[in-house]
Amino acid sequence: MLDFVPNHSAYDSPWMSINKDYYIRERPDVEHNSTFFFENGVAFGGKMWTDVAQLNYFNPETRQLMQEQMLKIASLSDGMRCDVAFMVSNSFFELSWKNELQYYNYTTPLTDFWEVSIAEVKRQYPNTIFLAEVYGSYVIDMITQGFDYVYDRDLLTHLTNGNVDEVRAYLYSTAEYEQYMARFLENHDENRAASFFKNRTTITNAAALIAYTVPGMRFLFQDFQFGYKFKLEVHLRRSYDEPKDQEAVKFYEKYLPIFTSDVFKYGEFEMVEIKGDDAFTFLAWKWKYEMEKRVVVVNFDENQRECFVVIKDAGEGKEEVEMQEMLSGVKITRKSKEVQEEGLFVIVRGYSGMIFTYN
């Protein structure tokens, strides 16, 4: 997957001399505003990036030019991550550049750029995967305009807040489009995951147990498995030297093969019932794919807690169900009816979890 930056070009791009109308331009009837515009009248990218030039997505020629760039990328890669994808949608773009667009007589296109361009790329390269960097209310827009996956920054926010009810409510409220979500704890724009969780590896690992076992893309960043604390700066292409966090390394040695298995990719996902006085600190769900079954239980709380996890398909047609906790390797046998009705009793350390395989 390659990075496609649609919103702007370099200030010294050859496009600038070919056709300035590719770009948003300052109105000549107002005093020059150096906060948002270069001396030649071309706008900074997004009014914030002062070293790049803002492309005009209400100009059909610009749209055609950028669609050609997408086709070139699609010919070279399996997909593209589209930088600040929401910023070129009609609604956002008009809100950002309304005065300039009106002055130069640009009107709102009948369709969004992504809707047309993604369809054309997929016509020529059907297997191309599109990932949108998007936030807030524009998430649904990017899905409806054709993206295969969209950033899920909100899950990271809720996990950072540390409120289990908040995380649970979010997962239920987004269930309709959960398969489109790209789940991540860090990326090139964000700080390292540990910084969101008080630099405590146990909390970071517990967040990973949640983020990477719910439906959607598992969007992993370079060296995530080493538990580094210092951000890998894009412009420097390096970070401070630091030792690997051995607790994180040992955790991912066991966890990585688990959450990348087929059952978590292609299986059927379902939230499960949790019982007991401590149920409010737990999150739990199960997956089923062909003959494989998994149930994930996470205690996202400081203290050791206990609960009953109701697994209605445990030991179907059998008196007993055989289970193995995959992170520890511990095997147990329980009465099927007990697990189906009362629930599997578990005691889980603070900020920890269990992943069971069962028949």
Q: Predicted segments — roles?
A:
Residues 1-359:
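Active-site and adjacent substrate-binding regions of carbohydrate-active enzymes
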